[in-house]
Amino acid sequence: MSVPVRYSSAAAEYAAEVDCELESTLQQQQQLHLQQQYEQYQHYQYQREQDIAYYCQLQAARQQEQLMQQRTSMSSSVMPGLALPQDHQDHPAALLNGPHNNNIGLAMDAHSINAILVDDEQPSTSAQAAAAAAASAGGSAGAGSGSGLGGAIGGGKLANGINRNAEMPTDWMRIADEGRYGTPGAAGLEYQKYEQQQQLEDLAESEAGAVGGASNNNGESSSSLKKLEDQLHALTSDELYETLKEYDVLQDKFHTVLLLPKESRREVTAGGRDGSAYVLRCLKMWYELPSDVLFSAMSLVDRFLDRMAVKPKHMACMSVASFHLAIKQLDLKPIPAEDLVTISQCGCTAGDLERMAGVIANKLGVQMGHAPITSVSYLRIYYALFRNLAKEIGGDFFKFYQQLIKLEELENRLEILMCDVKTTVITPSTLALVLICLHLDFHIKESYTRGSPELKHVFEYILFLQQYMRIPDRVFTCGFSIVSGILSHYNGQNKAPYKQRLVWKLSSRTLRVLRPINRFSSDLPTIEEGIPNALDDGLRSRTESISSEEEEDWPTSPIIPIFEQC
């Protein structure tokens, strides 16, 4: 049976249409599949770029964290937001959630670092008191001379503390750039380089057979003072005036005003600061170091107390670390940290002392090899200027100056003044000038009459120096009263030789191991009644045993009354 032609042609057309639709459907499916593959490839490229950017940001955050660790010189654990996940390349979900995790990590990083900076840069109570004194001094025109001086300097600190809330990356870049110029930031790296250099030098000296230890400092202490006096005598008055101008520009960098409370459990008190100063003075005399070490160390202590909120329990370690850092800053023979810890009994380890010294050097921007400008620097210049004046006057006055006015005695009295926190309200230039004027006045009253012609030149020169250093009369009068009061109190006490008993501290475990033996005890003969004592008082084994049991001006053991009361 044959199919009609019209039906066969319709079937052919229908088959052709079905084939065309099927072919177009297949083409559309292929295009859709290619488009999906292209979109997946673009998404993969985008995720890869996001991962690369995220990794770069993590590296930058790690570098910033290392910079913060160098700034604080303290080991801190890595923040969770900065940690790179281990399965970052293994799981696709971690790649898809990369930008979200990046934002969360950066937010946590910013909050954590802001909290650290707020905690580090939080001003102490003394700084707040100085700012309050500055505000009160600006509001009242009739304030006293002492409060006016403290307020003026405190106002300068308040002005310097403005604009602390700067942008974080900009602040870090500024710190990294300015650290090498002496401001906080890169001083920790400089301190580490100095440590390595000192270790290499010590190793070379030991291989060469050089004699180390405190004997070098002992031999150099007396000769260094003599060399210093010879250098001062060789300078002319014009050169000394130029030196005074240079010191006047830099003295504010190394001086601060401390307003510490008398009693406090959360903050270092004035007594704790003064007790630490006496301990450092004892260490200076024990190692026979020059006075520059003590003044540099106390400059570090005062500035660190003013900038940071130091707890009383950390005062011992901080003060001895400042002493250790001052020795290195002045390029003197370094003293091992273990010896300082043992002699000072500061209650910390040698590693703690080194870390604390790094923190102080980082916070204060200490530059190794550059001596700070302190009151002893001004005192030596004033001493040389008055010596030149005595040489110009000539006659008996020059002999009087050479015999009675000694630089070593002036430095000792300045050390006594430095151990009192009240002298921090006086600038170093004013303190040194007031001290040498008081010293001259004391010896002039004993050797000269009031109407001597030599005294007129001396008094006129004192007024000239006061005007040259731009010291107001009220400031000079205030400093005069403070210095005279401290020296009068010191001279009125019973002078006793410098002594400090070593206190042996044993743990409970060591006490349990020790056995009571009589090998270290000796029995003294019984003194019979009615027979004169055959033993002379000069043969007593303990010298000054009576006075050592009495109350003294400063504690016999520095750690018990000063540092363990907190």
From Swiss-Prot:
Superkingdom classification of source: Eukaryota
Annotated localization: Chromosome
Major location category of this protein: nucleus
GO biological process, any: meiotic DNA repair synthesis
Assigned keywords, A-Z: Cell cycle, Cell division, Chromosome, Cyclin, Developmental protein, DNA damage, DNA repair, DNA-binding, Growth regulation, Meiosis, Transcription, Transcription regulation
Family matches, as Pfam families: Cyclin_N
Gene3D superfamilies registered for this protein in UniProt: Cyclin-like
GO CC term (a single one): polytene chromosome
Disruption phenotype: Viable but females are sterile and produce eggs with a ventralized phenotype where the dorsal respiratory appendages are fused. Reduced levels of grk protein in the oocyte cytoplasm and very low levels in follicle cells and in the extracellular space separating the oocyte from the follicular epithelium but no effect on grk transcription. Increased incidence of DNA double-strand breaks in mutant germaria.
GO MF, any single term: cyclin-dependent protein serine/threonine kinase regulator activity
Domain Cyclin N-terminal: 285-368
Keyword Ubl conjugation applies: no
SUPFAM superfamilies assigned: Cyclin-like
Subunit structure: Interacts with corto. Interacts with the cyclin-dependent kinases Cdk2 and Cdk4. Interacts with Brca2 and Rad9. Interacts with polycomb protein Asx. Interacts with protein phosphatase 2A subunit wdb.
Family indicated by similarity: Belongs to the cyclin family. Cyclin G subfamily.
Known function: Cyclin with roles in multiple processes including transcription, meiotic recombination repair, cell cycle regulation, and promotion of normal growth and metabolism. Binds to the promoter region of the homeobox gene Abd-B and is involved in maintaining Abd-B expression in the pupal epithelium. Involved in the transcriptional repression of the homeotic genes Scr and Ubx.
Protein's recorded name: Cyclin G
Organism in which the protein naturally occurs: Drosophila melanogaster (Fruit fly)
Gene: CycG
